[in-house]
């Protein structure tokens, strides 16, 4: 029996497409990296099961982490999760927290994860960790000398974005906070002139929105196709970087010249200065140093803007949504802010920020409940892998973490853990910038978030200005289905901030 030509062609096409899909599925999955004895969460017996689990994880990450924690981690066992952005993660029980942070870089490291994000900005940044080094050392070490600049930018940006009207007005909460955070961050990154340039800030904010979809698409590509297809997947990032470069190039060139010729004590205390100093000390090529410094400033923006925006937004939501329970605490925060800022005539020094205890407690509590991902993520860097004390062997390239989201909500760690209660931190001796095995918002150990000291000062002072000058409440958007593209580009429905100036 003979088949018509079009039928044969169609059949061959279906078979070829099926084989191609199966091959792509094999090339893009990392299931082989998870030991067979480790159980999976939400990995079903279905065609393309791993890829489908990755897609579902974008919407049910919290539930998956909770199941891994209570069904397996609490029993001392590991569990595997498919992750929308990146390789699957093996969620280890909390008893391994100290073990994770004590391992040398030759055994476990976060650098391979950083490298993937560096590649989204510039291929030449893979393996370059100068941004983290400068944030951890120079920025943290100079914060006491930067409080004045930070305070000045907070006051100006809050007034510019939130307004001065004593009539109630409504503004988008997240977008407003994003601009304020971008301005404060860039005041310390590149100086006053650029941080108040609206087009520069628009590009700095847009970088995160351009990179997020790219992280998902690139992870689904086989390794052999990542290079050839990276041009397409990085298109929007390149457009945004071009906008940043137009503003940054002359500033970067001038700063390189200043570092080479000016006295050290005459150089501005900024991230760009310290990066230029280190780059020149390394002997970086004159043909690439400018591009690398621009890319590093972009990386600093990518690392700081969205995460800090999430924290201040979450805290303002918490204080509004639970006002019946925390109304008294909100008044304590407001009184504290008035006392501290009025005593220094709204020109605080570093020591004044240490007095904002109630505000720090509120931020710390919001950080505790804001975490939605696993924490202490590391990749096995030992070529021979590493073996846990229960005999589970983790091969080279495997990624491990702990269930930070669930740890923060475990009643065994926190009384009435699901409840937002800033007063629970009143007796805590640890500052917001330091973590514990029960509070992993900034990570823990020597590889904890390098910008945590800056973020702590920034958010405390920002909240103090808002509390002393405004009345506000947050209105949540109606519950609607949001498309994946809007989620990825952070353009879904957002909370509205109803606000008026009172001082």
UniProtKB/Swiss-Prot annotation:
Glycosylation site positions: 64, 324, 413
Tagged with keyword Metal-binding: yes
Superkingdom as given in the UniProt entry: Eukaryota
EC numbers on record: 1.-.-.-
Primary subcellular site in the record, as a coarse category: membrane
EC main group: oxidoreductase
Name recorded for this polypeptide: Cytochrome P450 monooxygenase ecdH
């Amino acid at each position: 029996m003979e088949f018509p030509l079009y039928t044969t062609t169609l059949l061959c096409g279906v078979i070829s497409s099926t084989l191609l899909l199966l091959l792509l599925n094999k090339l893009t999955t990392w299931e082989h990296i998870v030991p067979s004895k480790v159980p999976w969460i939400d990995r079903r017996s279905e065609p393309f099961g791993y890829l489908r689990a990755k897609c579902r994880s974008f919407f049910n990450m919290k539930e998956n982490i909770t199941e891994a924690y209570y069904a397996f981690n609490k029993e001392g066992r590991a569990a595997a999760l498919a992750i929308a952005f990146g390789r699957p993660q093996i969620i280890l029980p909390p008893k391994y927290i100290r073990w994770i942070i004590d391992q040398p870089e030759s055994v476990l490291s976060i650098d391979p994860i950083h490298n993937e994000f560096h590649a989204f900005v510039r291929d030449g940044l893979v393996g370059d960790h100068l941004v983290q080094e400068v944030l951890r050392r120079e920025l943290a070490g100079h914060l006491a000398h930067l409080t004045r600049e930070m305070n000045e930018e907070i006051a100006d940006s809050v007034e510019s974005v939130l307004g001065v009207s004593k009539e109630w007005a409504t503004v988008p909460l997240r977008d407003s906070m994003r601009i304020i955070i971008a301005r404060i961050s860039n005041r310390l990154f590149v100086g006053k002139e650029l941080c108040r340039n609206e087009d520069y800030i628009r590009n700095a904010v847009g970088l995160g929105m351009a990179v997020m979809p790219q992280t998902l698409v690139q992870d689904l590509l086989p390794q052999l196709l990542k290079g050839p297809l990276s041009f397409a997947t990085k298109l929007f990032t390149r457009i945004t970087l071009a906008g940043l470069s137009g503003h940054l190039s002359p500033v970067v060139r001038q700063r390189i010249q200043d570092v080479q010729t000016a006295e050290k004590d005459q150089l501005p205390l900024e991230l760009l200065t310290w990066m230029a100093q280190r780059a020149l000390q390394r002997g970086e090529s004159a043909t690439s140093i400018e591009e690398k410094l621009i890319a590093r400033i972009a990386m600093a923006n990518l690392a700081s803007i969205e995460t800090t925006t999430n924290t201040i937004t979450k805290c303002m939501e918490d204080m509004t949504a639970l006002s019946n329970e925390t109304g008294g605490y909100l008044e304590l925060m407001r009184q504290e802010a008035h006392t501290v800022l009025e005593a220094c005539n709204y020109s605080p020094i570093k020591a004044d920020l240490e007095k904002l205890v109630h505000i720090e407690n509120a931020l710390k509590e919001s950080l505790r409940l804001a975490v939605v991902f696993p924490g202490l993520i590391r990749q096995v860097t030992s070529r021979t892998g590493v073996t846990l004390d229960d005999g589970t062997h983790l091969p080279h390239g495997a990624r491990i973490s702990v269930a930070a989201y669930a740890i923060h909500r475990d009643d065994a760690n926190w009384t009435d853990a699901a409840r937002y209660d800033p007063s629970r931190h009143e007796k805590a001796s640890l500052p917001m910038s330091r973590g514990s095995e029960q509070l992993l918002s900034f990570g823990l150990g020597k590889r904890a978030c390098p910008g945590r000291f800056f973020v702590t000062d920034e958010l405390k002072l920002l909240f103090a200005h808002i509390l002393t000058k405004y009345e506000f409440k947050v209105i949540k958007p109606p519950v609607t289905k949001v498309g994946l593209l809007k989620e990825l580009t952070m353009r879904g429905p957002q909370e509205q901030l109803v606000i008026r100036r009172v001082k």
